[in-house]
A protein has these predicted regions:
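Tandem CBS (Cystathionine beta-synthase) repeat/Bateman regulatory domains
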Residues: 1-156
Length: 156
């Protein structure tokens, strides 16, 4: 069941990588990376690997488009959400959902011992729940049809 799934379980399925961009990069450069990799957010990482924030499509829409700024001259550091809302590897899927909901974010960097080990997105959460529900449905179908039990031979 998805209530026992941890952030680390999601990363073990999807991988521990993440896409990062320096704070001095332009919003336009960030959008190109996001489009090339079909992602909705990038981690903003300072020289030395320190996580500075998260830059998302939402940040772009609210802080560039609505304010009439230029994506070619505005830096990611000016637009990123900071400090970043982060998860730990031991955090349950339910806790990740609550963190996302309460903070109105769709991407959680997962931190272990001060280092980013991956990102859990709202899409990852939804996919995990769907997988869990499919497994439950299969178990129930097998139980109902008897497919998970050996055939019984009547002896009289």
């Amino acid at each position: 069941m998805y209530t026992t799934t941890l952030a680390s379980d999601i990363l073990n399925i999807k991988g521990h990588g993440y896409l990062g961009i320096p704070p001095e990069a332009t919003a336009y450069a960030a959008l190109e990376v996001m489009a090339d990799h079909d992602v909705g957010a990038l981690l903003v990482v300072e020289t030395g690997g320190k996580l500075a924030g998260v830059f998302s499509e939402r940040d772009y829409a609210r802080k560039v488009i609505l304010k009439g700024k230029s994506s070619r001259s505005t830096t990611v550091g000016e637009l990123m959400s900071s400090p970043p809302i982060c998860a730990s590897p031991e955090m349950s899927l339910q806790e990740c959902m609550m963190l996302m909901t309460n903070n109105h974010v769709r991407h959680l960097p997962v931190m272990d011992d001060g280092q980013v080990i991956g990102v859990v997105s709202i899409g990852d959460v939804v996919n995990s729940i769907i997988r869990s529900q499919e497994a439950t449905i299969n178990q129930l179908e097998n139980y109902i049809t008897g497919d998970d039990y050996p055939a019984r031979v009547a002896t009289h």
